[in-house]
Amino acid sequence: MFRPLTTIFLATLCLHLPAAQGESVPEEKTDVIPIAKIPDISPAKPGQFDRAFRRGVDFLLKTQNKDGSWGDHRVIGTWNILCPYPDGPLTFKTASTALCIAGLNASPLHHEPAVQEAMTRAEDYLIRTMPHLKRGDALCVYNTWAHTYVLDAMSMRAARLAPDSLRYRELKECARSQVKKLNELASAMGGWGYLT
């Protein structure tokens, strides 16, 4: 009689032992990424954004090149960038110009005559330059960025114009040629990667 009771006791103990161990307090996970805390920053003061837009637009108007573009091939600082001449610098210049057009066009100051004139000069530069833009070499494919940024800038600008205007047609044709170039530059899978 003692033996069956001992067996039942040990069997019951074995069954309850894992359940008791499972009730322990779980350990804190160490692989969890903490949620960033929102900084305690006061809201913008009236006019704060207006001043920032003014400074940015004034900077772009002041630094626009005589040919209507922005940027150049000189390295500022100590960065070395793979940039075969002459196509690499031209690609950077056209991409920078398109980004500046997009920024000016999106700013609340886009209606000012000086801003309109600067964007028109930049568009003229891109319309003249983009047909000659090509890949620098097999490794340097920055022209994909330039075609993309120019397509975006021309589309944004054309959206503010009357569809029957000459300028609208010029921008539309420039945008159409960027789409054609991007289709030619697409990878075998049909997209554009970092090195397409």
Write out the residue ranges for each language-model feature:
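Positively charged n-region of N-terminal signal peptides that target proteins for export
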Residues: 1-4
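Preference for long, amphipathic alpha-helical scaffolds in soluble/luminal domains
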Residues: 18-196
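Bacterial N-terminal signal peptides
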Residues: 6-16
